C-alpha cells in the first residue's frame, strides 16, 4: 500500500518533531481531525508509527522496523542505486531478493519474466506478484509484523534447498570494508542465502557507509559488485568493485 502525499507529510513532520497531536497535524495540513485519524490508522497498520493518546509518534528503531518506512527514507538515493545497477545485472534464471527496500527498488525495475524469484519479504513478494510470468516463491518462517519478513531456522532450512544464479541484497551498515546488520535474524538469513548464490550484488546508498550495525555479515570484497549512489572520500575501495 503506497503512502498518500498527506501521509508522507505526516511522516516528515514526525521525523522532525518525534511526537505530534492529531489537532496539530490537522491544523498544519489543513484537513479535519477525522481525516488525520484515518491516515494515522493506516500508517499504524503499516508499522510506520505508533498511536499515542490524541496523537502519534515514531516507533523506536523506526528505520529498522518497517519496510514502508525504509522505502520512504532516502528514496531518491535508492532509485539512483537501482538505476546504476541495472546495466550490470548478469544473465540469470533464479534470484534471491532479500527484505531490503533497496533491493525491492531494483527488482521493480528489472525484467523478471520467466525467472524464479525467491524472497523472505511479504511486501517484496506482493510487488513482484504484479509482474507477469514470474515463478515467485515466498519463504515461510517466523514473520515479523513490522518488517514483513520471515526469519528463523525454518526459513534458513528452506534456503539450503536452493542454488541461485544471483543475489540482490542490501545491509544495515558498511563498516571497515564489511557489511553489517542490526538484526541477528536478518544476518543469519542473508548468510545462508549468500552461501547458495553464484553472483552476489550488494546495493547500498551512501548513508550506509559509517552507519552502525552490530552483526557482521561478510567483507565487501566477497561481493561481485557493490552498487551505490556515491562513495564517501574516506572509503578504501582498492579491493572492492564499486559501481556508482
Model-based region annotation:
Residues 2-6, 15-23, 27-28, 34-99, ...:
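HTH-adjacent hinge/linker in prokaryotic transcriptional regulators
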Residues 86-89, 106-111, 227, 232-239:
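Alpha-helix C-terminal capping segments
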Residues 97-98, 119, 228:
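Short beta-strand scaffold positions
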Amino acid at each position: 500500500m503506497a503512502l498518500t502525499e498527506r501521509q508522507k507529510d505526516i511522516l516528515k513532520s514526525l521525523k522532525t518533531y518525534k511526537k505530534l497531536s492529531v489537532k496539530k497535524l490537522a491544523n498544519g495540513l489543513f484537513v479535519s481531525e477525522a481525516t488525520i485519524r484515518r491516515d494515522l490508522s493506516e500508517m499504524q497498520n503499516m508499522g510506520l508509527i505508533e498511536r499515542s493518546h490524541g496523537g502519534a509518534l515514531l516507533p523506536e528503531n523506526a528505520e529498522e522496523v518497517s519496510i514502508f518506512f525504509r522505502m520512504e527514507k532516502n528514496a531518491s538515493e535508492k532509485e539512483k542505486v537501482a538505476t546504476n545497477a541495472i546495466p550490470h545485472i548478469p544473465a540469470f534464471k533464479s534470484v534471491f531478493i532479500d527484505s531490503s527496500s533497496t533491493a525491492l527498488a531494483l527488482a521493480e525495475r528489472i525484467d523478471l519474466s520467466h525467472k524464479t524469484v525467491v524472497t523472505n519479504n511479504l511486501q517484496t513478494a506482493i510487488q513482484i506478484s504484479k509482474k507477469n510470468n514470474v515463478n515467485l516463491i515466498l519463504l515461510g518462517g517466523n514473520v515479523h509484523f513490522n518488517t514483513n519478513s520471515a526469519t528463523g531456522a525454518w526459513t534458513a532450512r528452506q534456503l539450503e534447498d536452493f542454488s541461485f544464479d544471483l543475489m540482490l541484497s542490501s545491509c544495515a551498515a558498511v563498516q571497515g570494508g564489511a557489511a553489517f546488520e542490526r538484526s541477528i535474524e536478518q544476518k543469519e538469513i542473508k548468510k545462508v542465502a549468500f552461501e547458495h548464490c553464484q553472483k552476489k550484488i550488494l546495493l547500498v546508498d551512501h548513508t550506509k557507509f559509517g552507519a552502525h550495525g552490530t552483526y557482521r555479515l561478510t567483507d565487501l570484497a566477497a561481493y561481485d559488485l557493490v552498487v551505490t549512489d556515491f562513495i564517501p572520500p574516506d572509503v578504501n575501495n582498492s579491493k572492492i568493485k564499486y559501481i556508482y
